Amino acid sequence: HTSTGVSKKNGFKHLKAGQTPAKLNSIDQEIFLEEKLKPVLKEATDNKRHVFFMDASHFVMSAFLGYLWCLTRIFIKAPSGRQRYNVLGALHAVTHQVVTFTNDQYINSYSVVELLKQIALEFTDLPITIVLDNAKYQRNAFVMGEASKLKIDLLFLPTYSPNLNLIERLWKFVKSECLYSKHYEKFPEFKTAINTCLSDTTNKHKEKLSTLLTHNFQLFNKTS
């Protein structure tokens, strides 16, 4: 018997190892999930509140290499330069609509406030909660003050909790859908591909995202 055969016979599976944030506090995460996140998500599913998950992703125009079914190995042409496209996004927890603020420089507190203003202007019918991490450009007096003026509740995640931020799954989806194993000759084409993918979350990608963006959150209580 081969080692592979013996392993399969004994119930072993060939799985890629996962990783967890080094400094996460599983107890804090569990309390947050049960006492804060689940209640607002229940309001969202009952159409009593708009809940968004906010985060920034910095897409660098480089070769995104993935796995392909092919007869011979395929090589993807690498673009010249390292231009970066910054997307500050807010993912609606129920409809999966994405509201974005984008630029080619950097994301800061003013970017966050601009996105909050967009959301407040568009979603006027229900209370609004934004779930976000503790990045300095998000958790500060300026942003919190502006959010208060806009009557937006900011719900900050426990530290080191990307697993509780739904939009993190969307960023991985975008890379898989329009960046992995694809070559874009020019930076505008690269940006357009990302923008198009994000604008199609409620139509073209609706079926795929309905299973990816469920309100089931993995907690890491049993890691080695």
Language-model features: locations:
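Short functional hotspots at interaction and active-site rims
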Residues: 1-224
